[in-house]
Regions:
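Short, surface-exposed loop and linker segments with low hydrophobicity and enrichment for Pro/Ser/Thr
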Residues: 1, 31-33, 64-69
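Short, extreme N-terminal segment that most often corresponds to the first beta-strand
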Residues: 1-22
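Short, surface-exposed beta-edge/turn micro-motifs
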Residues: 3-6, 35-38, 70-73
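Conserved beta-strand segments of the P-loop GTPase G domain that flank and frequently precede/overlap
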Residues: 9-11, 38-44, 76-78
């Protein structure tokens, strides 16, 4: 059994995650993870297909989900040598932390404080507990560090479903997820189904309702910038065969295309 695994935590309800999750083009299981959180679990091991490390695959997925969305995405991953997380929130630079297999911190302390700030965690109690995770601790390996991170996040409303725990192999996580009564698939269904899903993702995002429909020069400029950023990002993802980065570029391109189309049909006066 492979000891590589991963999961994605989204700070919103499953019905808000589903439209964007379907665009990842990988079989996923989606379940509630608290009152205002959802968890996405890959059904397979996509990092084995393209030869990319699990952390890069998960960062691409998190970026694709969080681009323009009003909710952040936290990717947790682990393999034989390391474990860590990446937090993506809108167009901000992702922030993450890594531990070696024996639990040795391998990142900057400031990253953990930025993580706490972006999630709105308690600046005293939560930050103090997170700071402990940046200090050497011979009794805690990398996977114990991830479990301690989840313990802190329970105070922010995270409640992982039964059997879903960081550090477990992907196959075991999949078995546990399939046994959950409220888990459901969120998977790629083909290009025809992707169009409405992509539009749903645009509509539900932070950028969806505002710029395209405002009919201002700012909206047009933003749409052009999104197209300019989305095309090379999508091309880079296709060259690297990275589904997450490809979808991130596609979503940016979709945002921009919607804005430009609206500007052409209803030009600004």
């Amino acid at each position: 059994m492979s000891n590589v695994g991963a999961l994605l935590l989204c700070r919103t309800r499953p019905e808000s995650v589903a439209p964007a999750a379907r665009l990842l083009r990988d079989r996923m299981l989606l379940a509630p993870a608290g009152d205002a959180w959802s968890v996405l679990l890959p059904e397979g091991r996509p990092w084995q297909r393209g030869g990319e490390p699990v952390d890069r695959v998960l960062t691409g997925w998190a970026t694709a989900l969080a681009v323009g969305a009003p909710w952040p995405v936290l990717a947790l991953w682990w393999d034989a040598d390391r474990a860590g997380f990446t937090l993506v929130s809108g167009f901000r630079r992702p922030v993450g932390y890594v531990w070696l297999a024996n639990g040795t911190p391998a990142a900057e302390d400031e990253a953990m404080r930025t993580f706490a700030d972006r999630l709105g965690l308690d600046p005293v109690l939560d930050v103090q507990d997170l700071d402990h995770l940046t200090k050497p601790d011979p009794g805690s390996d990398a996977r114990a560090r991830l479990r301690a991170l989840i313990a802190v996040l329970t105070r922010a409303g995270v409640t992982l479903p039964e059997g879903i725990a960081p550090g477990e192999p992907a196959d075991r996580l999949r078995e546990a997820a399939l046994a959950l009564p409220d888990a459901r698939p969120a998977e790629w269904q083909g290009r025809r189904e992707a169009v409405p899903a992509e539009l749903d993702a645009v509509e539900s995002s932070r950028l969806g309702p505002w710029p395209p429909w405002s009919g201002t020069p700012l909206a047009c400029a933003l749409a052009l910038a999104q197209v300019a950023a989305g095309l090379p990002l999508m091309a880079w993802g296709l060259r690297r065969r990275s589904g997450g980065w490809t979808v991130a570029g596609a979503l940016l391109l979709a945002h921009g295309a919607v804005g430009l189309a609206y500007d052409l049909v209803w030009p600004w006066d």
